[in-house]
């Protein structure tokens, strides 16, 4: 069974320092408290592009679940919706992109 995940892609914020403070001090702790059933959480900061231009996105969050069923149950909960609303509230560069996916991994 493939792992399922929610991927949240945040656009570059209007104020990077204010976003970073809200993300680290408010949002991540809130998400960890409210979003139940995750098997793994990965936060990524986008630091550049291959051509050196400013990237249009600033952060990517990946919330892993053991199955699509577990993800769907979690996503339907009021506590998860509270965390999602907070993600949108702190995203000053525009609404974040939220995707549901199944991970396919190849190991070398």
Regions found by a protein language model. Name each.
Residues 1-108:
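Macromolecular interaction modules
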